[in-house]
Swiss-Prot record:
The family this protein is said to belong to: Belongs to the tubulin family.
Descriptive protein name: Tubulin beta chain
Signal peptide: none
Primary localisation category: cytoplasm
Binding-site residues, GTP: 69, 138, 142-144, 204, 226
Location relative to the cell: Cytoplasm, Cytoskeleton
Chain spans, region Disordered: 427-450
Functional description taken from the UniProt entry: Tubulin is the major constituent of microtubules, a cylinder consisting of laterally associated linear protofilaments composed of alpha- and beta-tubulin heterodimers. Microtubules grow by the addition of GTP-tubulin dimers to the microtubule end, where a stabilizing cap forms. Below the cap, tubulin dimers are in GDP-bound state, owing to GTPase activity of alpha-tubulin.
One function term, GO molecular function aspect: GTP binding
InterPro entries: Beta-tubulin_BS, Beta_tubulin, Tub_FtsZ_C, Tubulin, Tubulin/FtsZ-like_C, Tubulin/FtsZ_2-layer-sand-dom, Tubulin/FtsZ_GTPase_sf, Tubulin_C
Amino acid sequence: MREIVHVQVGRCGNQIGSKFWEVISDEHGIDPCGRYHGDSDLQLERINVYYNEAFGAKYVPRAVLVDLEPSTMDSIRGGPYGSLYRPDNVVCGASGAGNNWAKGHYTEGADLLETVLDVVRKEAEGCDCLQGFQLVHSLGGGTGSGMGTLLLANLTDEYPDRITATYSVVPSPTVSETVVEPYNATLSVNQLIENSIQSYCIDNEALYYICHRTLKLMAPTYGALNHLVSLTMSGVTTCLRFPGQLNADLRKLAVNMIPFPRLHFFMPGFAPLTSRGSQQYRALTVPELTQQMFDAKNMMAACDPHRGRYLTVATVFRGRMSMKEIDEQILNVQKKNKDFFVEWIPNNVQTAVCDIPPRGMKMSATFIGNTTAIQEIFKRISEQFAAMFSRKAFLHWYTGEGMEEGDFAEADNNVSDLLSEYQQYQDATIDQEFEDEEEVEEQNDDSDEQ
């Protein structure tokens, strides 16, 4: 079987990660004690991707839970699904990272690293054919960002031929937890560019917009935000967990979605998103799902896809629906919005269908977009970073842990280069591509003649 080992790091990573396990356990008919109570063979057909079948038909998540302070772990252990996880796979420190990336990456996190890697190795050794890892973390704090990226770098070194996917919660100015978020996020994105194969960017600002505008929640809790993220993660992983043809493993998804290795930051979206009160007044149709799914208001990252162009898109429809109708609707969207899809990647929208809908829904659709508009998120972080770094504000907290100013400048430059690359491919046309190729050929011919 093609197994995936899941690693959740830091407070945010653990809260979202544990919600993800609740949602997919429910979808696969697994109760909080790990017993199967489902009603369909499809639930068990690929259960081994995320679960290990232990003694006495108990299904245990292939999950490693990491934090530098114990409070989140205590609440997970004390929660309804606390006994689902393997106790040995819960690793926590005592002191925390205090929202400091350097503590997570170089000092406190580094001290705990070998213990975590041992647990991950044990999980990986228990797999028949490991396809890769998924990391759930946030970029704004200290543990998820600093230790999360340290772990990612080590996994990339130790398992270079395996895919690493991250679900990364990006900080936003409207929902700020701490003043040093731009530093932590820039240092993290620098690492993700180099060490992640594919990253799903989830943005607190977008989640708040959805809760306010669409779901009509006046004071959204983190529970509501995490629920949105878990819906999206459940949708994104549908192809990996249930039998299907398209994007059925992490590598196939990467091959279809990533035309250039550094441009691997995806914008996820989900439909239907309707407020609880209005649900019973609407019968969902494939056209409506498709229209909602491509709508900026349904995106989990606060950037407008109409300000950029799609390099590639993958969509996952769930529920009983006609494949022909889905294909027609997707084609329709592409025709109507052809300016927002690069013309030099033909057939750049992939569609998968899974018969099993999420709990409580007849049908749903998940969107994964590789769009140049994602640069808006990085630009926002970069501007905030520059404002503080130009005054060297708060730097002493980082240099005190052994970092140097040069590390910050290097990270900022790498993010700036990424922005330029996105802009370059946003502006590229099919004619320009051919001209570039001809120029290269002419230069090669000239050098041959010499």
